[in-house]
Every structure is written in C-alpha cells, then in structure tokens.
Amino acid sequence: MRVKEQLLTLRAYVPGKNIEEVKREYGLSKIVKLASNENPFGCSARVTEALTSLASQYALYPDGYAFELRTKIAEHLGVKAEQLLFGSGLDEVIQMISRALLHEGTNVVMANPTFSQYHHHAVIEGAEVREVSLKDGIHDLDAMLEQVDEKTKIVWICNPNNPTGTYVEKQKLLSFLESVPKSALVIMDEAYYEYAEAEDYPQTLPLLEKYENLMVLRTFSKAYGLAAFRIGYAIGDAKLIGQLEVARLPFNTSTVAQSVALAALEDQAFLQDCVQKNAEGLNQYYAFCKEYNVFYYPSQTNFIFLKLGIPGNEAFERLMKKGYIVRSGAAFGIDDGIRITVGLKEENDEIIELLKELVNEQVQKEETYS
C-alpha cells in the first residue's frame, strides 16, 4: 500500500517543544514556553463560565452549521452569515480550501518564509508551489504578481506574516488586488489581526464587496487565547463559501469550541487588555534590541523575530537549557534568527537578561579573534 508520491516529500508538522517534554529532557522544574505564539494571559473568565454549563451536551453532536456562533460573528464583523466558513482551527480551513481548489496542473503563489501549511497542503493536492522571497522581511507583492498566471488558483498573503511579524501596507495591497487576475483567489491570513496596530494596516473586510476573489482568515487561537479548542474561520464571497462547505467535514467544530468562542467574543474588554499588554511587551524587546544593536523586525503580532549574531539553533538550545522555549529561525529557513512569543512582563524581563548574556558572549568572542 502506497500513499500519494508527493506525501513522501513532506514531513508531518512539528510544533514547538511542549513544557513537559522539556522538563523531562533537561531536568528543569520551571519552564516558560515562548514558542507557539499563544496568549500568555490565557482567555476570558467568561470562557470558564461557559464550560461549566456544557456537561449535559457531551453525548450530543454539535451544531454542524455553528448557527449561533455564525450569527454572532457576522454581526460583530458586519458581514453576512453565509459569508463564513468554520474549521477546527485555521489549519483545517487552509486544508479545506486547498482540497477544494487545487489539483495537478494548478499553482499557488506565496511568500518565503511564511506559514508552512500553505505549502504543505498545496503539495498534497499536487499543485505547483511558487514561492517568492520576502523583501526586507515583507511580502514582495510586485514579485508575487509576476508569478501569477492563468493556472494560479490561490495567492496566500499572511498579514501580519508568520514568522517575521511584518505586514503589507494598505496601498500596496489595493494595488495588488487591482492587478491580480480575478481567477486567482487572494487569501489574507489574518491570524494575528487583533494585534496589528499600524495606521496603514489594511482593513480587508470592507474590500470583500468589491473583490469577489478576496478571502480573509481569522482565528480564536491567538489573541482570544483559545488555542486548545481549535476554531477558526474564513470570510469571503457567499457563493464560494457555499461551495467550500462541501469540503467541510460534518460536525467539524465541537460544541465546546463553539461555546467558548461565543463567550470570548463577548468579552472585548479582555481582548483589548491583552493587546495593550502585548504592545508593552514588544516595547521591552525593542528597547533591548536597540541598546544591544540586535537586528529585529518591528512586529504587528504577539511575537518578535530577531538575530543575535549566533545560529538560531544554538540560541534555541541554550535558552531551552535555561528553561525558555523559543523557535529557531532554522525552522523557517532563517538560520541566524529566533522567534520569541511575547510573554508576561516578568517572563520578558527574564529572557531578555538571558539574551543579553548571549550577545555579550558573542561580542567577547569576536573581540578575542579580532
């Protein structure tokens, strides 16, 4: 029995190391995980309240259409309910879209590096992947447009981008949308949308009416702090969304996930508090980078990508031995960088002290050999 040939060229997704794994491996009692861009402040207290009322529903199938959540999100965003497609996290939404649109003879266009699942599912479906290197850490939309042809089914734009935290400006996006063929679906993955505060960050939902080939992805895993429950969604042209529903598994979002998402959505005060504290945390890292002349990408997310002057894998290992889990840039093809999730203030302070040690050691080595 053999699987598709293209599956043999891929690896299963490898998430960041989990806390218990690192405790066992290094014999540590305290671990701070700053690797997976989770919300360090947790989730709204209303989520806990919602969970207590669900015990009587565990034996029942969930609402496959997610009617109540669909209605509330549509109202919150100012879109129509039939414009929404729900998935077990954005990973499943990406899988559904790829499954429905891609096949051998088609192609997708994306940046490199960016979120790996765009590439992963395109390969599984037999599509050609056309990757365009980031320019100064940002999507090079002009170069991406040059890669689009009549066989291009999807253009992926992760905005803000993972792993760099950078963003595409409004005017550049508008110019791209005016130029790209209507036969290509432009998907804006806005998993980190709530954290983006730049004045020229594009507000894409008002553009959906004009551009039928535009789709937007959002999630409850990041700023809302519901990563464990796996729920994300797409917003797009109602006709296309209806066609994509055919590729959706029955009952793909659980009753629990729908209920906690509803509860989280209703607590916008908690969300805004998290966003504010995240901005303060980013400023801690910016201050360190400027003082120690460390390269970094200004971030519109809850993480920062920086370069310490040593290999990312080395920084990753040394920080992990101290009880701090980050992501090595090698995982994204940037061997000399690391990605760090913004944590609690004291967590940021602690890891920044470790980063200072790494930088100082590297400076001393360079002085010794100079």
Curated annotation (Swiss-Prot):
EC nos: 2.6.1.9
Sites bearing N6-(pyridoxal phosphate)lysine, chain numbering: K222
Record carries keyword rRNA processing: no
Pfam families per the UniProt record, alphabetical: Aminotran_1_2
Needed cofactors: pyridoxal 5'-phosphate
InterPro entries: Aminotrans_II_pyridoxalP_BS, Aminotransferase_I/II_large, HisP_aminotrans, HistidinolP_aminotransfase, PyrdxlP-dep_Trfase, PyrdxlP-dep_Trfase_major, PyrdxlP-dep_Trfase_small
Catalyzed reactions per annotation: L-histidinol phosphate + 2-oxoglutarate = 3-(imidazol-4-yl)-2-oxopropyl phosphate + L-glutamate
GO terms under biological process: L-histidine biosynthetic process
Pathway: Amino-acid biosynthesis; L-histidine biosynthesis; L-histidine from 5-phospho-alpha-D-ribose 1-diphosphate: step 7/9
PROSITE patterns the record matches: AA_TRANSFER_CLASS_2
Keywords: Amino-acid biosynthesis, Aminotransferase, Histidine biosynthesis, Pyridoxal phosphate, Transferase
Domain of life, source organism: Bacteria
Family: Belongs to the class-II pyridoxal-phosphate-dependent aminotransferase family. Histidinol-phosphate aminotransferase subfamily.
HAMAP family: HisC_aminotrans_2
Protein name: Histidinol-phosphate aminotransferase 1
Taxonomic classification: Bacteria, Bacillati, Bacillota, Bacilli, Bacillales
